[in-house]
UniProtKB/Swiss-Prot annotation:
Name of the featured protein: Protein-L-isoaspartate O-methyltransferase 1
Species of the source: Nitrosospira multiformis (strain ATCC 25196 / NCIMB 11849 / C 71)
Similarity annotation: Belongs to the methyltransferase superfamily. L-isoaspartyl/D-aspartyl protein methyltransferase family.
Subcellular location field: Cytoplasm
Reaction(s) catalysed by this chain's protein: [protein]-L-isoaspartate + S-adenosyl-L-methionine = [protein]-L-isoaspartate alpha-methyl ester + S-adenosyl-L-homocysteine
Gene name tied to this protein: pcm1
Length: 236
């Protein structure tokens, strides 16, 4: 977090003020954010479908109102209950790693504010998303419904165990750090499918991992980049 952002963030925290922006101003900030994400991606830029999704999804609708003017900064932001909305660069990277197709069925573990689910829903056919923190999950479900994401199915529950009755999934995205790849999720991943999951100890450096299930059922893993996520809660 740079000092200008920290200073402005602190001022909002102190005064509790909200500075409204117009739709055109938010649009301009969103386009700028996407350009910055592409530039920061280096040799691994997001593809056209991910770029289009992030250009469309209004991130300011997925953060607390008093943080809406910061929604298009390339930073994670608090969303309550000790959780955060991920940095846009990481959202783009994780989504790109899934290599989604328009007919795919995706499982997301950790709905949070619903932003990542909305990005996925702009690309895939159906998104199933699970949140263990009930108030957060209920807020996200209402938000996604109000924004017209009818292809997103939400549930309150322990994401470690996945969504067995909706399995198998073409892709699985875990938005909290686990100590290991959850076996129930691996079981629910289709042969030929991809899972993206951060692995590592809570609040320490973790690594974003790409897990690929081969057509014969064997599994390969690839370490992508160091990251820092809130810990996965629940059964694991």
């Amino acid at each position: 977090m740079n000092w200008q952002f920290a200073t402005a963030f602190g001022a909002l925290m102190y005064f509790g003020c909200v500075i409204p922006l117009s739709a055109a101003e938010y649009e301009a900030l969103r386009q700028k954010m996407v350009r910055e994400v592409i530039a920061a991606s280096g040799n691994s830029p997001p593809g056209a479908s991910v770029v289009a999704a992030m250009e469309k999804v209004e991130r300011h609708r997925f953060v607390p109102a008093w943080l809406s003017i910061f929604a298009y900064r390339n930073h994670p932001l608090p969303i309550g209950h000790g959780q955060t909305i991920s940095q846009p660069l990481i959202v783009a990277r994780m989504t790109e790693l899934l290599k989604l197709k328009k007919d795919d069925k995706v499982l997301e573990i950790g709905t949070g504010s619903g932003y990542q689910a909305a990005v996925l829903a702009e690309i895939a056919k159906t998104v199933y998303t699970i949140e263990i923190i009930e108030p957060l999950g209920n807020e996200a479900a209402g938000r996604l419904q109000s924004l017209g994401y009818d292809n997103v199915k939400t549930r309150i529950g322990d994401g470690y165990y996945g969504w067995p009755e909706a399995a198998p999934f073409d892709a699985i995205l875990v938005t909290a750090a686990a100590s290991h790849v959850p076996p129930p999720l691996l079981k629910q991943l289709k042969p030929g499918g991809r899972m993206v999951v951060p692995l590592g100890a809570p609040f320490m450096t973790q690594y974003l991992m790409l897990v690929e299930k081969q057509p014969d059922g064997s599994v390969t893993t690839h370490q992508i980049v160091p990251v820092r996520f809130v810990p996965l809660r629940g059964g694991h």
